[in-house]
């Protein structure tokens, strides 16, 4: 049997008039919609029941047939078929036009397809279509030229001169249709190919464009005449509804207005033609019909848009598809779903990591069908109907059944904005009183949630498969690591950190110091009986099983540390157990801060896996909350002690500033130097004040404890509270040289307060803009990477890339070890000292092996990379390496493209927006933060361009009064000279040796220049390290592989330069594998291969250049993408994720991949019996 959703590809094309008539159930002849008295549709109107089907289920228009039993009968009185009203969503009608009109997409798009095909300019075409000029269709014997334009006067003169029937000229779409019908596509393509060989410059570009359109029509089987419309399809009435409002008025979709205008003008034109009206009147009516159809298809594309009440432009068919509110993004890519709810969240410190609290009434509504089924199964209710009644009346026995139903049925919690995949996680629900969802405190970081009124949505996975996926892949206890860098995301925060810090502190001279206890329990008992203090240094005998023998030893520790270590595995590697002295020590024998907790979790995950780690995390959470309550840390004004040394430091700074001012006034230093020295001095003074403050604070000072543990606040905030606020930035981003001397404890004066608010407002405005920009960047990244999925185990390539540490100046931004962990080698790695092979080729490098490689002194390693992967679509598991979220090798079917896009986009909001101004020097305003990342991914020419050397060689600098020039002398004697513009800073000095592609002046490099000089590999390396620099400077870690995936997608296309004997067109962009395939075909027959160069496309261009027209159309420029796809008759192979979501199939990733499709799931009750239960409408 043919299944509707079982297809492999989807094709788009132009519709012929015959096809449109075939779709239609009848012709719409009248502009009427609904009779205002009877509220029934008018016959032959836009809502006609005869054409589109009945308004009410199983009921004809006149009421002769009512009820299901007449199903399928066509009423003999009113001609309406008795069927479901739902058919009004699918049945189409049509309008027969009295005169053909052109389709605005093909005439007006850029480039104009109609214009290219006929070799006419769009302006000339417009004159003909809108009845301003005649066009010669057949000159016959006259000296007129074919396709020559004649205005009214010239036409009259020609008719007078040559006679009435001596030539044929026409106007409007009819004339164009006739000319389009005469075009011979095959001959035209041949002729254009001949011309292409001789032409150059602009002419060549135009020929290539024309050839592309001609070949598209020839190959796709579209007839050029179909760009002119004779029949207009009318979409089903329920997709353009008309609803009655309270006051008896009607609200209608804009499309009805647009259709009405078309029908009115069409009918008027028919009348005029029947009456044989004068030519000029008919022509005017035809022009108006053309404009009405234009407005229906794409309102506002040409001339002023048709407006409705209140001067609002009407939404045309094109607008229905476009933009965020269009069909693609609103209804196809994201739908509202049943079995979901939302509520405010509150903290649930008593929950386990895999649990969430679900309000009772919400749970009952969400699990209603399950509860009803269970009630019937248990015999509490006799049938579904009575079960439904029980649930609706909320009888007491319903709650017991609900408890049973939700055990082992995970739910998904989601918080908007979902910036990465941890924004949706699965939890085991626990019923709670009240109306708020309870969330585990450790899940907050992943969701970026807090409890100041945030809301979250709950979704119920229905099928057994969905439940299994939620339980195994999405349970919060398993998502401990961040997919972007593989570090733990569930690190305890705030109170939990403070409690752990308090617990592991020690205080000299505390009560009971130096006492000795026979075991842990005795020590804890002494603490609980208030004999000793929790922070006192004591001696305890601890017992350990070593090689099956119980041994003991005395260690020096505190009760707090003993309690803390009870919940921590004692083999995490923080203590060297081989050492006799350390054999019995506690694993965590240091002061625990947020940072060290991260390391503890990391180690635990690597050694014990997620399950044990999540148990440990729950224990740390419980301890943290308990002991931060016992510690009772508070904050008071008296805790902020201003260091007495501050005033001396300020006085000393003032004196230095005076000296600098004097030097400047005497002309020893320039304005820039003075400014920089003043800023430097104040920065240093502020630091000194802050250091003095930190030294003077007691270790048990609550503010110090909070900052030091990482629970809340930081050194810089304490500096502002009790030290001095220091330098502030002005809204332009320039640092003001007037520092704020006071701290908040002392209080700011009016000027200081004003200066500090000045810069702060800029920060707030930036944050608001940043969110939108960052979201848009994520959307483009997702679009360009969405079809990158791990498709196979090993692509078998021998290629790879060399990696070494990334440096910015002398500072190491990313270490080599970090770049090696979780990657496969592309060649044997040999120890340079001993000559032994450390790692063989194609081997996996875990942290231990990576350590070995780095400690052998190797600086450069060749690894497998997504860049060099030979997979036709997606990447292979070996080129990708480790899955950052699980710290294991990646599985086939993982959607690594989406993960990469999310990993880069999610921290986007943390990046800065501003351009830093370093003084007033030209050319040194380098873009940083989010704009810089965008500039790189869009492969734009950057602001503040650096001059780049094109050859290897030695530098010679020449300075004259007028200009500076740099000469690079190559090895083969060739010399390149570069003029240095005023104000640029040189990066090289006289006599330096530089490589091709190195910067001569400071600034950013245009990635396209690097592509030309160093090739694709150089450009890829440059983009990767530049993006890494931006993120690392903001303290964000992103693994290289995510950037590799994106940059790979940017360099996938080849620009064809010469076509050789292939079918490729010069100047077109084509996928690199298609290019190689076309050449391989030609090679078999010994023909001439095509030549091309790899291109670097920005992410927007790369996303639009995808093979899938559905994916591209749902991204941006919808009409342009669909116009092109229709003319080419494109076939969408449905390879990526978006296109499959759009047509409603399972996505080809994860368990949706073909290789996993056949799996059968067994639930606990071995056999699933599908008892047919009656469904109550």
Swiss-Prot record:
Its cofactor is Mg(2+); Zn(2+). Its EC number is 2.7.7.6. Zn(2+) 2 binds at residues 795, 869, 876, 879. Disulfide bonds: none annotated. InterPro entries: DNA-dir_RpoC_beta_prime, DNA-dir_RpoC_beta_prime_bact, RNA_pol_asu, RNA_pol_N, RNA_pol_Rpb1_1, RNA_pol_Rpb1_3, RNA_pol_Rpb1_3_sf, RNA_pol_Rpb1_4. Mg(2+) binds at residues 450, 452, 454. GO terms for molecular function: DNA binding; DNA-directed RNA polymerase activity; magnesium ion binding; zinc ion binding. The RNAP catalytic core consists of 2 alpha, 1 beta, 1 beta' and 1 omega subunit. When a sigma factor is associated with the core the holoenzyme is formed, which can initiate transcription. Belongs to the RNA polymerase beta' chain family. DNA-dependent RNA polymerase catalyzes the transcription of DNA into RNA using the four ribonucleoside triphosphates as substrates. This is DNA-directed RNA polymerase subunit beta'. It comes from Clostridium botulinum (strain Alaska E43 / Type E3).
């Amino acid at each position: 049997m043919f299944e509707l959703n079982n297809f492999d590809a989807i094709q788009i094309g132009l519709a012929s008039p015959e096809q449109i008539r075939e779709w239609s159930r009848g012709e719409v002849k009248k502009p009427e919609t609904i009779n205002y008295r009877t509220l029934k549709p008018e016959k032959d109107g836009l809502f006609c029941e005869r054409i589109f089907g009945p308004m009410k289920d199983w009921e004809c228009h006149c009421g002769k047939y009512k009820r299901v039993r007449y199903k399928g009968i066509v009423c003999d009185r009113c001609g309406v078929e008795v069927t479901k009203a739902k058919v009004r969503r699918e049945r189409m009608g049509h309008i027969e036009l009295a005169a053909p009109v052109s389709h605005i997409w093909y005439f007006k798009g850029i480039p104009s397809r109609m214009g290219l095909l006929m070799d006419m300019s769009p302006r000339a075409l417009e004159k003909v279509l809108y009845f301003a000029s005649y066009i010669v269709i057949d000159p016959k014997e006259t000296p007129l030229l074919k396709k020559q334009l004649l205005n009214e006067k010239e036409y009259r003169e020609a008719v007078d001169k040559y006679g009435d029937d001596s030539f044929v000229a026409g106007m409007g779409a009819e004339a164009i249709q006739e000319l389009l019908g005469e075009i011979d596509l095959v001959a035209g393509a041949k002729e254009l190919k001949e011309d292409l060989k001789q032409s150059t410059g602009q002419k060549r570009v135009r020929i290539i464009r024309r050839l592309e359109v001609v070949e598209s029509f020839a190959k796709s089987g579209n007839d050029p005449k179909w760009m002119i419309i004779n029949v207009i399809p009318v979409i089903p009435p329920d997709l353009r509804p008309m609803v009655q409002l309270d006051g008896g008025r009607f609200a209608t979709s804009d499309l009805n207005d647009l259709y009405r205008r078309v029908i009115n003008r069409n009918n008027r034109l028919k009348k005029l033609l029947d009456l044989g009206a004068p030519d000029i009147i008919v022509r005017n009516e035809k022009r108006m019909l053309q404009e009405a159809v234009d407005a229906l298809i794409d309102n506002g594309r040409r001339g002023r848009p048709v407006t409705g009440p209140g001067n609002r432009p009407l939404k045309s068919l094109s607008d229905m598809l476009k933009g965020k509110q269009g069909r693609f993004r609103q209804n196809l890519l994201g739908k509202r779903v049943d079995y979901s709810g939302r509520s405010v969240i509150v903290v649930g410190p008593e929950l386990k990591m895999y649990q969430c609290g679900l309000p009772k009434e919400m749970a009952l509504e969400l699990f209603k069908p399950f509860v009803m089924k269970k009630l019937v199964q248990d015999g509490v209710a006799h049938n579904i109907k009575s079960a439904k009644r029980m649930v609706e009346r909320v009888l007491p026995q319903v709650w017991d059944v609900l408890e049973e139903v939700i055990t082992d049925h995970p739910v998904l919690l989601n918080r908007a904005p979902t910036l990465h995949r941890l924004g949706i996680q699965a939890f085991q629900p626990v019923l709670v009183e009240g109306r708020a969802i309870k969330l585990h405190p450790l899940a907050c970081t992943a969701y970026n949630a807090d409890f100041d009124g945030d809301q979250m949505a709950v979704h119920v996975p229905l099928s057994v498969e969905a439940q299994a996926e939620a339980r195994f892949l999405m349970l919060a206890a398993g998502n401990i690591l961040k997919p972007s860098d593989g570090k733990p995301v569930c690190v305890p925060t705030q109170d939990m950190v403070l409690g752990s810090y308090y617990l592991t502190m020690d205080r000299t001279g505390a009560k009971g110091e130096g006492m000795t206890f026979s075991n842990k329990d005795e020590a804890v008992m002494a603490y609980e009986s208030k004999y000793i203090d929790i922070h006192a240094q004591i001696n305890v005998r601890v017992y350990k099983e070593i090689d099956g023998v119980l041994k003991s030893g005395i260690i020096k520790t505190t009760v707090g540390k003993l309690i803390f270590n009870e919940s921590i595995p004692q083999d995490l590697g923080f203590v060297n157990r081989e050492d006799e002295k350390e054999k019995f020590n506690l694993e965590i024998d240091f002061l625990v801060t947020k940072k060290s907790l991260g390391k503890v979790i990391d180690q635990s995950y690597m050694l014990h896996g997620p399950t044990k780690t999540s148990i440990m995390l729950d224990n740390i959470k419980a301890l943290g909350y308990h002991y931060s309550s016992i510690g009772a840390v508070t904050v008071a004004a008296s805790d902020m002690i201003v260091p007495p040394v501050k005033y001396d430091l300020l006085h000393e700074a003032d004196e230095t500033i005076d000296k600098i001012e004097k030097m400047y006034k005497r002309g020893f230093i320039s304005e820039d130097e003075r400014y920089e020295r003043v800023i430097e001095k104040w920065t240093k003074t502020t630091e000194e004040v802050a250091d003095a403050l930190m030294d003077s604070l007691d270790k048990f000072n609550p503010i110090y404890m909070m900052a030091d543990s990482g629970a809340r606040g930081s050194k810089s905030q304490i500096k502002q509270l009790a030290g001095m606020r220091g330098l502030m930035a002005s809204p332009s981003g320039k640092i003001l040289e007037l520092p704020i001397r006071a701290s908040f404890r002392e209080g700011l004066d009016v000027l200081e307060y004003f200066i500090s608010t000045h810069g702060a407002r800029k920060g707030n405005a930036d944050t608001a803009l940043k969110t939108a920009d960052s979201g848009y960047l994520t959307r483009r990244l997702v679009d360009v990477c969405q079809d990158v999925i791990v498709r196979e185990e090993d692509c078998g390539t021998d290629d790879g890339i060399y990696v070494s540490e990334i440096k910015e100046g002398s500072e190491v931004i990313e270490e080599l070890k970090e770049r090696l962990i979780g990657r496969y080698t592309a060649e044997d790695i040999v120890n340079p000292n001993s000559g032994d092979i450390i790692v063989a080729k194609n081997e996996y490098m875990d942290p231990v092996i990576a350590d070995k490689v780095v400690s052998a002194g190797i600086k450069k390693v060749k690894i497998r990379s997504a860049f060099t992967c030979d997979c036709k679509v997606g990447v292979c598991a070996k080129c990708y390496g480790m899955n950052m979220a699980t710290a294991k090798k990646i599985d086939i079917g993982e959607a690594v493209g989406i993960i990469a896009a999310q990993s880069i986009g999610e921290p986007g909001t943390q990046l800065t927006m501003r351009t830093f101004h370093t003084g007033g020097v030209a050319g040194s305003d380098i873009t940083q933060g989010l704009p810089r990342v965008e500039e790189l991914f869009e492969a734009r020419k950057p602001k503040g361009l650096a001059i780049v050397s094109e050859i290897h060689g030695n530098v010679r600098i020449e300075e004259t009064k007028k200009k500076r020039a740099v000469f690079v002398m190559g090895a083969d004697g060739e010399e390149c000279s570069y003029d240095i513009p005023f104000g640029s800073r040189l990066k090289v000095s006289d006599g330096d040796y530089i490589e091709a592609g190195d910067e001569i002046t400071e600034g950013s490099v245009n990635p396209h220049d690097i592509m030309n000089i160093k090739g694709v590999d150089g450009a890829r390396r440059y983009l990767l390290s530049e993006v890494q620099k931006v993120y690392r400077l903001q303290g964000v870690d992103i693994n290289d592989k995510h950037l590799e995936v994106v940059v790979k997608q940017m360099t996938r296309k080849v620009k064809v330069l010469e076509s050789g004997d292939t079918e490729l067109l010069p100047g077109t962009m084509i996928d690199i594998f298609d290019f190689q395939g076309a050449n391989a075909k030609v090679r078999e027959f010994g023909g001439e291969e095509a030549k091309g160069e790899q291109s670097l496309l920005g992410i927007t261009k790369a996303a639009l250049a995808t093979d899938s027209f559905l994916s591209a159309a749902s991204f941006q420029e919808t009409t342009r993408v669909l116009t092109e796809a229709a003319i080419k008759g494109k076939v969408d192979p449905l390879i990526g994720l978006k296109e499959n979501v759009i047509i409603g199939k399972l996505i080809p990733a994860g368990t949706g991949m073909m290789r996993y499709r056949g799996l059968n799931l067994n639930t606990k009750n071995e056999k699933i019996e599908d008892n047919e239960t009656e469904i109550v409408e």
